[in-house]
Amino acid sequence: HYTLQQAILLQSLATWLALNIKLHLQVQEMAVLASADELTGTFNRREFVQESNQTMQHFSHTRVPFTIGILDIDHFKQLNDCYGHTAGDHVLKKMTKKIKDILREGDFLARIGGEEFAIILPACLGDEAMRVFKRICSTIEAMEVHYEQEVLCFTVSIGVAEVGKHDADAEDVFKRADKALYCAKQAGRNRIHFAN
């Protein structure tokens, strides 16, 4: 049997615990929202920067290499202008799902802006990385995204860079992948360009 004072104390403790659990769950939910792209459900740019820095630190300690790919939908502005932003959003969601299906466990996908995505392939270089990116390109090129009465087809360009001995940080690898993306676009789009 509890005294009235003990019962009040237990009730207060139970209320305090319930509030703390609720607060903890809300903090966890906020952390997920802060790291996720709302439209596609992938990680966002902030999370990409954090993940690429951690991957670079891991490389510095273990020498386990990695590859970064920057993917951009070709002529996405025209797709948005012609069919509307809702159609563009639909394309982004469908494409993201296809890419997730292709990537290996442990690979990292983030939407870093508009129609641009970043992919980190840990412990993956050269021909193996090229196979992953070729599969992404060919899968997307073969996609038919149905939107209202329209069938939308599109392609992507990808710039790729492997971590190298001269890279001081993850930003260096990212910049080389971004330049490679620009080269892929300049060379006619719907292609992959590996940075030197």
Task: Describe every region a protein language model picked out.
Residues 31-50, 71-85, 93:
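Conserved nucleotide-binding and Mg2+-coordinating catalytic segments in signaling enzymes
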Residues 2-22:
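Amphipathic alpha-helical "output/dimerization" segments
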Residues 130, 134, 148, 163-195:
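Catalytic-core segments of nucleotide cyclases and related cyclic-nucleotide turnover enzymes
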